[in-house]
């Protein structure tokens, strides 16, 4: 099983989806421009309602800026980065279609194509700020995909991340 993650702290903390890591005992982590494969043996923190988890590797990393905004804007251009079907760091683009409330979680609906393995990847604005964490896509719909909004990421991982306003 493969998935994606986002570095949120320079001490090696990585944000991903709980459904990516919840059945694992160890997690192999790759970084761009680094041939070494790192292993994480522990889920540091998780939230089952938000489908978020944090793991840690022993590597200094440059974190991605987390953008906290009032609301993502419909029609706003976005970029999705993940590892669909194991294809490392694949980039696709699209727009924000809507912001949806699903019980306890507010999700961003977006059109950038994703596939299995994209979960845990970054949904970025055009300035490289994290708008959300890619979480789901519907096979029956075309480019009908969801990401956990950055405001929930901030609440969940507040003591791990650097916030950009």
Place the predicted regions along the sequence by residue.
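A generic structural motif
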Residues: 11, 44-47, 58, 97-100, ...
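C-terminal cap/linker of serine protease catalytic domains
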Residues: 62-63, 84, 130-165
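Conserved beta-strand residues within beta-sheet cores
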Residues: 2-4, 40, 93, 111, ...
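Short, compositionally biased
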Residues: 91-103, 146-149
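Short, Lys/Arg- and Gly-enriched loop/turn segments at beta-strand edges
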Residues: 86-94, 141-142
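Catalytic nucleophile loop of clan PA
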Residues: 6-7, 96, 113-134
